[in-house]
Amino acid sequence: MTVSTCATQLPVVTSTLLENAPVAKGIWKLRLGSAEIASNFVPGQFVMLRIADRTDPLIGRALAIYSADAKVGTQRSWIELVYQVKGRMTTQLAELVSGQRLELWGPLGNAFSDKVVEHLVMVAGGIGQTPFLT
């Protein structure tokens, strides 16, 4: 008998770009309409992202969820992702405008523990600090 601990299928969610704006030199924030992901997100998780209808780059990129607002029962739920413009994919992301479509799968990854501890040390640098801001 085998026990599977992995999902057999991870649905892809097509999301609409609501906002794409620079927040610092070379750092951008995406706001995407996504009720499915916003309502299931737990701080510390990420999504895989691809630009819809493009095959270059073929492989999606992992981006930490910066913020989310799940407005239950409405179409106004969103998630925010922060990224650094560094390569081909992020350069293409920075050129996107509101209304364009992206493909997401997630939320993925282990969320932060909510266990109360006496001492906690968290270390992050650069764009890697995004999940700590949620």
What role is predicted for each listed range?
Residues 2-98:
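Ferredoxin-reductase
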